[in-house]
Curated annotation (Swiss-Prot):
Annotated cofactor note: Binds 1 [4Fe-4S] cluster per heterodimer. The cluster is bound at the heterodimer interface by residues from both subunits.
Superkingdom as given in the UniProt entry: Bacteria
Encoding gene (name): chlN
The organism of origin for this protein: Prochlorococcus marinus (strain MIT 9303)
Subunit structure: Protochlorophyllide reductase is composed of three subunits; ChlL, ChlN and ChlB. Forms a heterotetramer of two ChlB and two ChlN subunits.
Catalytic activity: chlorophyllide a + oxidized 2[4Fe-4S]-[ferredoxin] + 2 ADP + 2 phosphate = protochlorophyllide a + reduced 2[4Fe-4S]-[ferredoxin] + 2 ATP + 2 H2O
Alphabetized NCBIfam families for the sequence: DPOR_bchN, PRK02842.1
GO molecular function terms attached to this record: 4 iron, 4 sulfur cluster binding; ATP binding; metal ion binding; oxidoreductase activity, acting on iron-sulfur proteins as donors; oxidoreductase activity, acting on the CH-CH group of donors, iron-sulfur protein as acceptor
Official protein name in the record: Light-independent protochlorophyllide reductase subunit N
A Pfam family assignment: Oxidored_nitro
Length: 418
C-alpha cells in the first residue's frame, strides 16, 4: 500500500442512478416490493434497466411525483398513503415494502422515514415498510444496495451463536457453491444478507463474523459492527486469488487448520488457473484504464494485473474506504495510480493521451470512446454477471477479453475493406 500512489480529484462526474440496484434486489427477494417515489424518468429507467414489461407485474413500481407535488400544491404524504394501500390490496403476497427515495423526492424533502414509520403503525406487522435512498445525487449506482441492506440490519434478531454472514447480493448458484465450500472447510453455520426471502433475516451478534462480497457496502458494514459483528479483513472474492484469500480469512477466524483449507481449495485453484490460461494469453501486456463508477475498480485491477497480466494505466474509484480496501491496495503493483473522485473531462483527456487498450467505464462514455477507436467495457455489466468465487475467475476474465476481441475483428474488417 505504501508504494501505491493515492490521488484525489473533484469536478464534473459521469454517474449512473442508484435506483438501478432495485433490478438485482427485487430478483433476490421475491416477497419484497420496491416502490420508487420519483418522477416518470425514474419509472422509465427502472423498467428499461430491468427489461421487464410493466404488464408482467414486476416486484417494483413508481409512485410518480407530479408537478403539483413538486410545487408543494398537493399533499404528497396523503397521495403516497393511497398508492401504498392500493398496492398492498392488489398484491397481498408482499411481505416487505421498500420505499425508495429518488432525486425528486429528496429535492422536495419528502421524509420517507416518517412515512415508513406511519405505515408500519397502520399495517401492524402484516407488511414491514422500510425506506432508503436510491438517489444518484451524491452516490454511485451500486450504493442503492448498501442503503437497502442497511435498512434491514435493525430488524435482524440478536444471537451470540458463532456463525459466518455473507453480506452482499450474489447469483444464487454462486452463493450455493460458496456455502458448500464453507461447509467443507468446517464452517457449518453460514447465512446471507440479503436473504432469499425478505422476512427470513439472519441473526447477528458478537459471535457473527462478516465477509463482505461487495466493496460498496460501507454503511451496512458499519451497522453490523454496531450490532457486535466482526468484519473480516480480506480481499474481495473476485478472481481465483482474491476468492481464496477471502475464504482463508473466514477459515482463520474460525480456527480451521491451514492444511485442511489447502486440501479443499488447491484443486479448485489448479482448475481455475487452467481455465484462465486462454484469456490470460489475450489479456497479458494489454493496458487498461478503469474509470470510477461501480466501486469494484480496485478489486478488478488487482485481478486483472496479478492473474491476467494486464498493465494498470489508472485505477479510478468514486470513493475510497482505506480500511475496507487495505487488503486490496496491498496487492496492487508498485506505483499504481489510484484516483479517488472524478473530474470526467480531465480523466477523458488522460485516456486520450495514454490510449489504453481497454477502458472500463459507464455506458454514457462508452460509445464516444468506441468512436475514437478505444475499446470499452461497461462497468454495470460486471454487477449483473456471476463473477464471484474461484470457479468464476475465467468467466470474469472473459468479460474483459471479449471487447478486445471485438475490436480486433473490427480492425481486421477495416483492413480488408481498404
Amino acid at each position: 500500500m505504501g508504494s501505491t500512489t493515492l490521488l484525489k480529484e473533484s469536478g464534473p462526474r459521469e454517474v449512473f442512478c442508484g435506483l438501478t440496484s432495485i433490478v438485482w434486489l427485487h430478483r433476490r427477494m421475491p416477497d419484497a416490493f420496491f416502490l420508487v417515489v420519483g418522477s416518470r424518468t425514474c419509472a422509465h429507467l427502472i423498467q428499461s434497466a430491468a427489461g421487464v414489461m410493466i404488464f408482467a407485474e414486476p416486484r417494483f413500481g413508481t409512485a410518480i411525483l407530479e408537478e403539483r407535488d413538486l410545487a408543494g400544491l398537493a399533499d404528497a404524504h396523503e397521495e403516497l398513503d393511497r398508492v401504498v394501500n392500493d398496492l398492498l390490496a392488489r398484491r397481498p403476497e408482499i411481505r416487505t415494502l421498500f420505499l425508495v427515495g429518488s432525486c425528486p423526492s429528496e429535492v422536495i424533502k419528502l421524509d420517507l422515514a416518517r412515512v415508513a414509520e406511519r405505515l408500519n403503525g397502520q399495517l401492524q406487522g402484516g407488511v414491514r415498510v422500510l425506506n432508503y435512498s436510491g438517489s444518484g445525487i451524491e452516490t454511485t449506482f451500486t450504493q442503492g444496495e448498501d442503503g437497502a441492506l442497511k435498512a434491514m440490519v435493525p430488524l435482524m434478531p440478536n444471537s451470540n451463536e458463532a456463525q459466518l454472514l455473507l453480506v452482499g447480493t450474489m447469483a444464487n448458484a454462486v452463493e450455493d457453491r460458496l456455502k458448500h465450500l464453507f461447509e467443507r472447510l468446517g464452517i457449518p453455520s453460514v447465512s446471507s444478507l440479503p436473504p432469499r426471502q425478505s422476512t427470513d433475516l439472519p441473526s447477528v451478534g458478537p459471535g457473527t463474523r462478516v465477509l463482505l462480497t461487495q466493496p460498496y457496502l460501507t454503511d451496512t458494514a458499519r451497522e453490523l459492527k454496531d450490532r457486535g459483528a466482526e468484519i473480516l479483513q480480506a480481499p474481495f472474492p473476485l478472481g481465483a486469488e482474491g476468492s481464496r484469500l477471502w475464504m482463508e480469512a473466514a477459515a482463520q477466524a474460525f480456527g480451521i487448520n491451514g492444511s485442511h483449507v489447502a486440501t479443499i481449495l488447491e484443486p479448485l485453484m489448479v482448475r481455475a488457473q487452467k481455465a484462465l490460461s486462454p484469456y490470460k494469453e489475450q489479456l497479458a501486456g494489454k493496458r487498461i484504464f478503469l474509470m470510477p463508477e461501480s466501486q469494484l475498480e480496485i478489486p478488478l485491477a488487482r485481478f486483472l494485473h496479478r492473474e491476467c497480466g494486464m498493465e494498470l494505466v489508472e485505477v479510478g474509484v468514486p470513493y475510497l474506504n482505506r480500511d475496507m480496501m487495505q487488503s486490496e491496495l496491498e496487492l496492487l503493483p508498485p506505483n499504481t495510480q489510484v484516483m479517488e473522485g472524478q473530474h470526467v473531462e480531465k480523466q477523458l483527456d488522460r485516456v486520450r493521451e495514454q490510449r489504453p487498450d481497454l477502458v472500463v467505464c459507464g455506458m454514457g462514455l462508452a460509445n464516444p470512446l468506441e468512436a475514437e477507436e478505444i475499446a470499452t467495457k461497461w462497468s454495470i455489466e460486471l454487477i449483473f454477471s456471476p463473477i464471484h468465487g474461484i470457479d468464476q475467475a475465467a468467466d470474469l476474465a472473459e468479460l474483459f477479453a471479449r471487447p478486445l476481441h471485438r475490436r480486433d475483428l473490427l480492425n481486421n474488417q477495416l483492413l480488408v475493406s481498404v
